[in-house]
Amino acid sequence: MKMETFLVCLFHNAAGLHQQIQEILYLLRMHIYETNLYLKQELSRLIYPNRQLSFVLLMPLSLLRNWDDIEYLTDIVDDKQTLHYAANLLTIYVLHLSMYQKLTKPYFLLAVKRVSEKLNKKQRHSFYEVLVTSETLNNYENLPKNILNTLMFAVRYVFKPTPNYSEIIAELEKKNKIHHIIFNMVITDFQQIREQHMCKHLCETNNELRQECKEIIFDLKVVGNV
């Protein structure tokens, strides 16, 4: 097995390793990405054949600052499989970088925005649905607060530029237990109508959701503009 391929396997199975080992792997990975074009291509090939999207979403921030590389996001296609793939990569990406506090809002949102811009309203809604229900986020209750807030911010951004209050409420009503990330997005994006509509709606339809609304409003005020 080539050393580069071995390192790729290490990177993808590092979740259970001690944090110090993870940090070493992260720094090593950054160095390899910056010096080894072969590994960039190899990683992209292993994750998703003939797609550069994986390379863009998984690269370290030092490379993500390269605007030319960001253009690879235009490789997104319209099928459902790719939406699932892109959404899961985004969640993996933000989780990985958040572990080392390497994440800064503009760079992650840039990737989210570039994917979102390639989709029409229906496709963007599907992408949003996949993102907030992806396998990674199903374990959101175990996520540190800073990671959850970052994911919340990303979901808000994906659903723009034309968020529709009625559509989001309809989506909430489809779920027996509301997802914290969707809920945070709704409250943050619709602060103007929260008191008039959101609380009234929840109070009339679901006491459990009403209580959950109260519990997270304080967190949002503390977080502010994440």
UniProtKB/Swiss-Prot annotation:
Tagged with keyword Electron transport: no
Signal peptide, first to last residue: 1-16
Function: Plays a role in the inhibition of host NF-kappa-B and IRF3 signaling pathways. Mechanistically, promotes the degradation of host IKBKG through enhancing its ubiquitination leading to inhibition of both pathways.
GO BP terms: symbiont-mediated suppression of host NF-kappaB cascade
Protein's organism: African swine fever virus (isolate Pig/Kenya/KEN-50/1950)
Induction: Expressed in the intermediate phase of the viral replicative cycle (immediately after DNA replication).
Glycosylation sites: N164
Keyword Glycoprotein: yes
Family: Belongs to the asfivirus I226R family.
Protein name: Late protein I226R
Keyword set, alphabetical order: Glycoprotein, Host-virus interaction, Inhibition of host NF-kappa-B by virus, Late protein, Signal
